[in-house]
């Protein structure tokens, strides 16, 4: 018998999840607190966080649950979702995710825990995968340049509208939209157009541009191909007519259909947009999925989002990188026409690998089978006396059944199949990769007809017009032909992931990015079919599990932030910003204050802030930042007075982008409110606030959150993300809504921000699980440890590198900025040199030169244990000693391990003529040969890649370098 008998209830609990999520245990935290000079976490945060913003009470959240309990709760929610056969279509289709891709990409932390490939030398695997994706999109659309993903089809179409505005000839003209476009796409375009003054006209374009519209100035035209109704028509005459009128032409195209149909590029399109969801990505109740955009060459340098290109490294070997980054919002700020940054990399990788796995022949077979099912279904309906509206279609047909549509849709539902109710007389039916013979039979039964599949198969003919059949070859690169066996595919995926650095390998201390644990328990339910295979427009009664989860997550996020209402629709932080600013705009306009259009933004703000403000129809006015990193209060006061009658909103990040808790934040908010403005608190740094302070209580009217930062959704190598927007009650009537799901938002809302009603709903179980696993106290402790870890690093590095900004008590928030400018001035060693040298030490670099050029911003998060924090600190201290050797002349300025970093395994072979040893190059202080990370390439020549733009798969020999 033991001296102390543990109660059964304690034994049943096991180790709390909090101890799995938070890296430093109690003993380690005591050591860290001693280093920082505090006796407890409460004492530390009592000093760091200004009194005026502190929570008066604990978070009112359900208590923490064990991992087993949370999985059981999620299983109960999942069981309340009914997964019927989906034949709704409208841009979302059933698809089979090849298990080798599901297990080795979607469920693999080597892929889903990576960050955006800003450090290309340690991102070669996913950059190659994204190049595959770009090649698939470019070749299927017949356009030379494709981006590395957008957020969804609706936002891609809206981005095409903005690109047309920027690049088109008739810049003040209207934007004409095909009435047969997807309804959610039309709605997103209208939401995005209104604030910027773009007139959108929706018209039937089946017979060309109507005369009354053709007489007007047209900036751009968007055509759906095939149409939402299923119609396949020759759009070339329409494209030619639009071009004659000086318009830019965008075609929203189905990639699977393009394996059989003439490409948009060949038909004359300038831009092609769409979604790659049906290339192996589960529907997920609306997302996440990778949208796409491909463009003609003259538009390439204005393409929104990320673009992967081919360059060379220091040895002249082929290497991949993000190209033309000066296009992006973090560079262009208020001059940007898009706020897209992180998009949908993980899903783009999956879609690209789907094409690699199936190859062009496999994709054609899937497309032909899908089309055959549609033709058999149509012939059976026609034989039973049902009118099929269009004679040419790919996968979708529309049936006319006067007065019977609702009855038929209900009968099909009873038979286990969801159809799309168009109106009282029309029913739309879509086939896909997962369609079965039994589903065809269920549809016929619902219509009251019978069909013999074998007989109809023998008689049915393809309906695609001969003139539109694709004749050119595509996906001819060897990568789309050499991985047919699962063994080969498995090894290809492993080779690529081994080239990358992700959280499964080590800490990623990127400031303002919050690269914390994405726990397996949180991730596991995402691929359950009850969550993954539900169509976003399925009837609400079939999605009760999802709707309950969504409501609970919204309520819990509202409690955490102090807001009254939260919308989960925005599928990225950038879209959350836009949604929040549109809510502010809607509020002012409802009050008759249309003149309130000025948005005040500190000079240190995230680049998306300014870009989003412009997209919301606002005028950006920059507020100075003081020498201590805080907002220049005097300049702010002056700007408030100058624009008092025009002031719409102040956008601030809290804690600030300089990594400190600003003491005057409540006073700043009060000044803006007194002048009639609203306060937008950017939630990028919420990981320093949860459980300690609530933006909605210290003056914020609206915030977006980043569930892919604070609430554990993985970054996926550059997406997916979720950017919910939280608002005070007076702004709630102006949150996003959706035309196809009334439950998704208020009737008075600004319209949809995303194509799907609840955005990337498929990954919301991750954040729901995190909050449930941690409980209110656990969330608070996670925040406190995040603050402790940042201060621990700051204290350890301060003797070697100046910490640029501190707040109350000389403390930082959850991140710290170290100033390398004095070192660079004295030695010539740049911030880039130190970032690349960290690779040799086995680390991803911190954030470079943001928000201050020549600095590193370090955010360790609460998930890294003391051993990893110390390993990073020791690497930085060792690098500081290396910089001294350069400064003293012991190592030449142009030939030292910093200037030549990173070093590859290939560098060890052959002659060695450097002023430092091989060991100093690849096994610097503290680096073990046993678990060394070897970068696959040396430093990449960024300028070469932009001068020689190549954005699709290079010749095969490049893969062997």
From Swiss-Prot:
Keyword terms: Oxidoreductase, Pyridoxal phosphate
CDD domains xrefs: GDC-P (cd00613)
Catalytic activity: N(6)-[(R)-lipoyl]-L-lysyl-[glycine-cleavage complex H protein] + glycine + H(+) = N(6)-[(R)-S(8)-aminomethyldihydrolipoyl]-L-lysyl-[glycine-cleavage complex H protein] + CO2
Gene Ontology CC annotations of this record: cytosol; glycine cleavage complex
BP-aspect Gene Ontology terms: biosynthetic process; glycine decarboxylation via glycine cleavage system
Oxidoreductase listed as a keyword: yes
Leader peptide range in chain numbering: none
UniProt EC number: 1.4.4.2
Domain of life: Bacteria
Required cofactor names: pyridoxal 5'-phosphate
Heme as UniProt keyword: no
Molecular function terms from GO: glycine binding; glycine dehydrogenase (decarboxylating) activity; pyridoxal phosphate binding
Location of N6-(pyridoxal phosphate)lysine modifications: 709
One Pfam family linked to the record: GcvP2_C
Stored InterPro entries: GcvP, GDC-P_C, GDC-P_N, GDC_P, PyrdxlP-dep_Trfase, PyrdxlP-dep_Trfase_major, PyrdxlP-dep_Trfase_small
Residue intervals passing through the bilayer: none
Family: Belongs to the GcvP family.
Task of the protein: The glycine cleavage system catalyzes the degradation of glycine. The P protein binds the alpha-amino group of glycine through its pyridoxal phosphate cofactor; CO(2) is released and the remaining methylamine moiety is then transferred to the lipoamide cofactor of the H protein.
Complexes and interactors: The glycine cleavage system is composed of four proteins: P, T, L and H.
Name the UniProt record assigns to this protein: Glycine dehydrogenase (decarboxylating)
Species, as recorded: Streptomyces avermitilis (strain ATCC 31267 / DSM 46492 / JCM 5070 / NBRC 14893 / NCIMB 12804 / NRRL 8165 / MA-4680)
């Amino acid at each position: 018998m033991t001296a102390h008998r543990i109660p059964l209830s304690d034994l049943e609990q096991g180790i709390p999840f909090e101890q799995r999520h938070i890296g430093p245990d109690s003993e380690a935290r005591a050591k860290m607190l001693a280093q920082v000079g505090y006796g407890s976490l409460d004492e530390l945060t009592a000093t760091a966080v200004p009194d005026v913003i502190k929570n008066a009470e604990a978070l009112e959240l359900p208590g923490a649950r064990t991992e087993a309990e949370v999985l059981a709760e999620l299983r109960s929610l999942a069981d309340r979702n009914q997964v019927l056969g989906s034949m709704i279509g409208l841009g979302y289709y059933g698809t089979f995710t090849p298990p080798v891709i599901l297990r080795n990409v979607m469920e693999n932390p080597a892929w889903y825990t990576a960050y955006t490939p800003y450090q290309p030398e340690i991102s070669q695997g996913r950059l190659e995968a994204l190049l595959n994706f770009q090649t698939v999109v470019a070749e299927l659309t017949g356009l030379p340049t494709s981006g590395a993903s957008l957020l969804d089809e609706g936002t891609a179409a809206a981005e095409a509208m903005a690109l047309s505005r920027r690049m088109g000839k008739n810049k003040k003209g209207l934007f004409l939209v095909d009435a047969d476009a997807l309804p959610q796409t039309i709605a997103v375009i209208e939401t995005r157009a209104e604030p910027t003054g773009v007139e959108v006209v929706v018209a039937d374009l089946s017979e060309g541009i109507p005369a009354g519209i053709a007489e007007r100035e047209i900036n751009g035209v968007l055509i759906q191909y095939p149409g939402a109704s299923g119609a396949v028509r020759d759009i070339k005459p329409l494209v030619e007519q639009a071009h004659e009128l000086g318009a830019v032409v965008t075609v929203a195209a189905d990639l699977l259909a393009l394996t059989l149909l003439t490409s948009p590029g060949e038909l004359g399109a300038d831009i092609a947009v769409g979604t790659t969801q049906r290339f192996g990505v589960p529907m997920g109740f609306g997302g996440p999925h990778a949208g796409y955009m491909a463009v003609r060459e003259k538009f390439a340098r204005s393409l929104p989002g990320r673009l992967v290109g081919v360059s060379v490294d220091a040895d002249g070997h082929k290497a991949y990188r993000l190209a033309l980054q000066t296009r992006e919002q973090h560079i262009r700020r208020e001059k940007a026409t898009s706020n897209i940054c992180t998009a949908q990399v993980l899903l783009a990788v999956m879609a690209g690998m789907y094409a690699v796995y199936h190859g062009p022949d496999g994709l054609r077979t899937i497309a032909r089978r899908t089309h055959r099912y549609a033709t058999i279904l149509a012939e059976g309906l026609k034989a039973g006396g049902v009118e099929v509206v269009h004679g040419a279609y790919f996968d979708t047909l529309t049936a006319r059944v006067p007065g019977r549509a609702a009855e038929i849709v209900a009968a099909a539902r009873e038979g286990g199949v969801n159809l799309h109710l168009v109106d009282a007389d029309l029913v739309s039916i879509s086939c896909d990769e997962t369609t079965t013979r039994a589903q065809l039979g269920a549809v016929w039964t619902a219509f009251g007809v019978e069909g013999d599949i074998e007989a109809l198969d023998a008689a049915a003919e393809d309906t695609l017009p001969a003139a539109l059949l694709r004749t050119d070859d595509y996906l001819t690169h060897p990568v789309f032909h050499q991985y047919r066996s699962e063994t080969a595919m498995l090894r290809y995926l492993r080779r690529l992931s081994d080239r990358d650095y992700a959280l499964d390998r080590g800490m990623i201390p990127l400031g303002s990015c919050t690269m914390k644990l994405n726990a397996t328990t949180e991730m596991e339910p995402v691929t359950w079919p009850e969550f993954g295979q539900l169509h976003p427009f399925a009837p609400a009664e079939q999605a009760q599990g999802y709707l309950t989860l969504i409501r609970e997550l919204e309520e819990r996020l509202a409690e955490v932030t102090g807001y009254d209402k939260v919308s989960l629709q925005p599928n990225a932080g950038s879209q959350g910003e836009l949604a929040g600013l549109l809510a502010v705009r809607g509020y002012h306009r409802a009050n008759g204050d249309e003149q309130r259009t000025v948005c005040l933004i500190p000079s240190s703000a995230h680049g998306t802030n300014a870009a989003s403000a412009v997209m919301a129809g606002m005028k950006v006015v920059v507020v100075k930042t003081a020498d201590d990193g805080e907002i220049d209060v005097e300049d702010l006061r002056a700007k408030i007075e100058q624009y008092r009658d025009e002031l719409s909103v102040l956008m601030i990040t809290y804690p600030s982008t300089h990594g400190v808790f600003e003491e005057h934040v409540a006073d700043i908010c009060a000044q803006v409110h007194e002048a009639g403005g609203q306060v937008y608190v950017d939630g990028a740094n919420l990981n320093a606030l949860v459980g300690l302070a609530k933006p909605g209580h210290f003056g914020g009217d609206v915030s977006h959150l980043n569930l892919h930062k604070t609430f554990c959704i993985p970054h996926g190598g550059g997406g997916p993300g979720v950017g919910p927007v939280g608002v005070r009650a007076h702004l709630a009537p102006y949150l996003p809504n959706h035309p196809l799901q009334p439950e998704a938002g208020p009737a008075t809302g600004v319209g949809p921000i995303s194509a799907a009603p609840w955005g990337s709903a498929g990954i919301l179980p991750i954040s729901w699980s995190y909050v449930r696993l941690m409980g209110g106290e656990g969330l608070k402790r996670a925040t406190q440890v995040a603050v402790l870890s940042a201060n621990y690093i700051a204290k350890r590095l301060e003797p070697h590198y100046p910490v640029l900004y501190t707040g109350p008590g000389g403390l930082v928030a959850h991140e710290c900025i170290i100033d390398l400018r004095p070192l660079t001035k004295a030695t010539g060693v740049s911030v880039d040199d130190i970032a690349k040298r960290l690779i040799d030490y086995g680390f991803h670099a911190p954030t470079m030169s943001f928000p201050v050029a020549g600095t590193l911003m370090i955010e360790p998060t609460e998930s890294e244990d003391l051993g990893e924090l110390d390993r990073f600190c020791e690497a930085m201290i060792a690098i500081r000693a290396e910089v001294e050797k350069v400064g003293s002349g012991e190592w030449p300025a142009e030939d030292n391990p910093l200037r030549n970093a990173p070093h590859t395994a290939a560098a060890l072979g052959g002659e060695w003529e450097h002023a430092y040893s091989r060991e100093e190059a690849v096994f610097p202080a503290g680096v073990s040969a046993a678990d060394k990370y070897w970068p696959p390439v040396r430093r990449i020549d960024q300028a070469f890649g932009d001068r020689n733009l190549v954005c699709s798969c290079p010749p095969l020999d490049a893969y062997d370098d």
